[in-house]
């Protein structure tokens, strides 16, 4: 991979040789690994053996052909434009803001009137995730759009610094039995908000649509 010398991310890059006060494990890139904060892992070179200064971008497969995205907002395009050859591409770079619901999952047994904690993680390639919101809707289609009136603030865990995963949680008491759809939305320090529409490109890159989890709430005994 190659990075422009004017790219500010170079000031944050690390050549790592240890992890948790131990030599870097083989699976994590021993003996040294390049860390490019906020960027997709294709830049995090394992087994780093050399760094070269070039007078132009590297033209190897992984820069010129692989891991490329449309040069459009959010890397979005259409199959028709790809087929017609109308898509200009650029190397993939930063990860978009994204969040996940970790628990409950679809197999969790929930009980009406019994409080539970919804938990998840959030991160962004543009800094820290500094806002989380949760939406809980009964009999709500998992493919329908969400409105701003549906969002409730969630509690964020400790901030370990830019680009790190950040936990979040929200306590919810299901009011009655039924099917509910949970949705989570993150916002990062640059003001980027997780969208509720998908993105399409041939590689499937940059997908960060709001995640949903359907749960079933039963009656209390």
Which positions does each model-derived feature cover?
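Extended, aromatic/histidine-rich regions of cofactor-dependent oxidoreductases associated
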Residues: 1-221
């Amino acid at each position: 991979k190659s990075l422009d010398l004017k790219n500010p991310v170079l000031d944050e890059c690390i050549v790592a040789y240890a992890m948790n006060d131990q030599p870097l494990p083989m699976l994590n890139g021993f003996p040294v690994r390049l860390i490019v904060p906020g960027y997709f892992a294709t830049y995090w070179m394992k087994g780093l053996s050399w760094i070269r200064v070039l007078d132009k971008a590297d033209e190897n497969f992984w820069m010129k052909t692989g891991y490329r995205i449309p040069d459009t907002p959010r890397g979005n395009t259409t199959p028709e434009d790809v087929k017609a050859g109308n898509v200009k591409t650029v190397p993939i770079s930063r990860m978009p803001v994204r969040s996940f619901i970790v628990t409950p999952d679809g197999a969790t047994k929930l009980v009406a009137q019994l409080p539970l904690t919804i938990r998840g993680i959030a991160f962004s390639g543009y800094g820290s995730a500094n806002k989380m919101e949760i939406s809980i809707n009964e009999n709500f289609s998992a493919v329908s759009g969400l409105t701003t009136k549906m969002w409730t603030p969630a509690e964020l865990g400790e901030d370990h610094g830019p680009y790190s995963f950040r936990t979040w949680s929200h306590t919810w008491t299901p009011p009655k039995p039924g099917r509910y759809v949970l949705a989570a939305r993150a916002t990062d320090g640059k003001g980027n908000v997780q969208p509720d529409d998908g993105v399409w490109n041939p590689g499937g890159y940059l997908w960060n649509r709001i995640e949903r989890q359907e749960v079933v709430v039963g009656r209390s005994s």
